[in-house]
A protein has these predicted regions:
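N-terminal export signals
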Residues: 2, 13-33
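His/Cys-centered metal/cofactor-coordination and adjacent catalytic loops
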Residues: 72-78, 119-161
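Active-site nucleophile/metal-coordination loop of metallo-enzymes that catalyze phosphate/sulfate
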Residues: 91, 100-125
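Short active-site alpha-helical segment characteristic of glycosyltransferases
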Residues: 161, 177, 391, 414
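Residue-level detector of anion-binding/catalytic polar loops
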Residues: 95, 171, 318, 454
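Conserved S-adenosyl-L-methionine
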Residues: 95-100, 176
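Active-site-proximal cap/lid insertion segments
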Residues: 38-50, 57-80, 88, 101-104, ...
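Short, surface-exposed beta-strand/loop micro-motifs that present aromatic residues
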Residues: 162, 444-449, 453-457
Length: 544
């Protein structure tokens, strides 16, 4: 049976089984009841299920929040950024030191929705305008490798979060950035903003007339930066309606912040313009806060973060006001890693992670993650490795389903671990898989993380094995493959076996490769700088 046929059968059987399980649960509770209690049993079945709210943030570094993701590392947070609501959530919930995602937005969103790794789903790169992605792009025709195509939309037979939860009585909404093509309404979401990408969130650009240049300054009358206020109002309305109707709900608020295209309220910006550390930056870089381009202004980025925090707070306040705080899980997490220069505004702070978005070094895939909910110990920290494709089985588990019945997924439920269960060796050493067989400022490469160890394979330079020990070297400064050949070989073989098993696509050697063309490309310097290395790598200026 081929992969596509298997997926169709799995989804059909899964949805059918979910409906039967949901029905059996209701009937089981009311088997000896009167007609009236049978009717009420359905309400009880819904009422005892927790609500789930996922606040999904765009392009946010692991250390891009004021919440330390590692208490032993000053560089794991950004103290200049004020986000009191996020900090309160961290005090009341659980932080995840080792949370991982995909290196880019669209693939990450597919992982969240389907519980599948990117090599399994075939969705390995973001949705741009190129069709098919990169293979026909002249920019890459003389590069060392021919990067493969990627799936362009969700497999119609993949089970999404909304589809998995619906048979368990849930109503689901997805607001904000979708960026997976296809209509969220066809994936189980009753309320959504359509097949959105980055563009709606860049409001200053999205509302331009043809030929009109993008504003370099924030308008004085900006009231809905990154649509974060209007998205939040929709989210609040959805929660109010579901509570009124007695429905458990799944709400995903996929914010356009903190993606570039910096937008914020002017009054919030003024606060950071006048911050002593930002003032020092203006002076050092000979910039005037009254004329600086908004894309270069650290005050704009910091203010965008604080405005976002206000919208997070509005959601948390409404949850409390509705009386559902004790029965609602709230998750805040980023879609991919990043590298924010604003960290360096604080004297003494340097970048703790290697590389950034588009790379499988930790700077591209390690993300901030905080979860609050019933059974989660306030102020706790989880240090096991978790990944974005764990969300679907976790949410399904919270909703009363059996995550073991979910087929063709790679994630596992984290529910028991959040409730205090100590992870065993099997969990701590499980394999996490990452696959980015494309060019950007990066190069085609794949990675596996297993416990403390990480192997990265660069397809254009396969003779340089990469192994790092993240427990001792979070900045991935030392390649220890030569000293540990057996560990490297074991993990490399497991990664390549997995990629083959799930039908992953690979880049190919380019017979038309022209070294001079590749060398002259403006992004090749970074590709070399952050490519494979032996022994100790050279530190970047913002790490020294």
């Amino acid at each position: 049976m081929n992969k596509e046929a298997a997926m169709k059968i799995d989804r059909r059987n899964f949805l059918k089984q979910c409906a039967l399980v949901a029905g059996a649960s209701v009937l089981g509770r009311s088997a000896l009841a009167t007609d009236k209690s049978v009717k009420n049993s359905s309400t009880d079945f819904k009422a005892d299920k927790p609500n789930i709210v996922l606040l999904y943030i765009d392009d946010w570094a692991w250390n891009g929040t004021p919440v330390a993701m590692d208490d032993a590392m000053d560089k794991s947070h950004m103290p200049i950024l004020q986000m009191p609501n996020l900090e309160k959530l961290a005090r009341e919930g659980m932080r995840f030191r080792n949370a991982y995602a995909s290196p880019q937005c669209s693939p990450a969103r597919v992982c969240v929705q389907t519980g599948q790794s990117n090599p399994r789903s075939g969705f390995t790169v973001y949705l741009g305008a190129k069709e098919p992605y990169y293979d026909t792009n002249k920019e890459y025709q003389k590069f060392p490798l021919v990067p493969n195509v990627s799936d362009r939309e969700l497999d119609k037979d993949a089970v999404t979060i909304a589809e998995a939860l619906k048979p368990l009585g849930y109503v689901s909404a997805h607001l904000g950035k979708w960026h997976m093509r296809g209509d969220p309404g066809n994936e189980g979401y009753v309320l959504h903003d359509g097949a959105t990408d980055n563009n709606p969130g860049n409001t200053l650009k999205a509302n331009l007339k043809p030929g009109e240049p993008t504003p370099k300054r924030l308008p004085k009358d900006m009231t809905d930066p990154k649509l974060m206020f209007s998205i939040t109002e929709k989210a609040i309305g959805f929660m109010e309606e579901q509570v009124k109707e007695g429905n458990p709900f799944y709400l995903q608020i996929s914010h356009y912040a903190m993606h570039e295209g910096r937008e914020c309220l002017n009054k919030t910006r003024e606060k950071y313009v006048n911050h002593p550390l930002v003032q020092a930056w203006y002076k050092k870089n000979n910039k005037d806060p009254e004329t600086i381009n908004r894309k270069d202004d650290p005050a704009n980025w910091l203010a965008m973060g604080e405005d976002l925090d206000g919208r997070i707070g509005a959601v948390l306040d409404k949850i409390k006001e509705l009386g559902i705080e004790d029965n609602t899980y709230v998750i805040v997490v980023a879609d991919n890693g990043y590298r924010h220069e604003e960290l360096e505004l604080t004297p003494g702070l340097k970048q703790p992670l290697h590389a950034r978005k588009w790379w499988l070094w930790d700077g591209g895939i390690r993300v901030p993650m905080i979860v609050k909910g019933s059974g989660i110990k306030p102020g706790s920290v989880f240090t096991g490795n978790v990944v974005n494709y764990d969300f679907l089985p976790t949410f399904y588990d919270w909703a009363g389903g059996d995550p073991e019945k979910l087929q063709n997924i790679d994630g596992i439920s984290l529910a028991d671990y959040m409730a205090g269960k100590e992870p065993d060796k099997t969990f701590l050493n499980r394999n996490l898989y990452f696959h980015y067989p494309h060019y950007r400022s990066s190069v085609p490469h794949s990675a596996i993380i297993s416990g403390p160890f990480k192997v990265i394979h660069f397809y254009a330079e396969p003779d340089i094995p990469i192994l790092v020990d993240l427990s001792k070297d979070l900045g991935e400064m030392s390649n220890i493959a030569k000293q540990n050949p057996e560990t490297h070989r074991k993990l490399y073989d497991e990664m390549m076996d997995y990629l083959k098993e799930v039908g992953a696509r690979y880049p190919k050697v380019n017979p038309d490769y022209d070294p001079e063309v590749y060398k002259m490309d403006k992004k090749t310097k970074e590709r070399i700088q952050w490519g494979p290395f032996e022994g100790q790598r050279t530190l970047d200026d913002d790490e020294i």
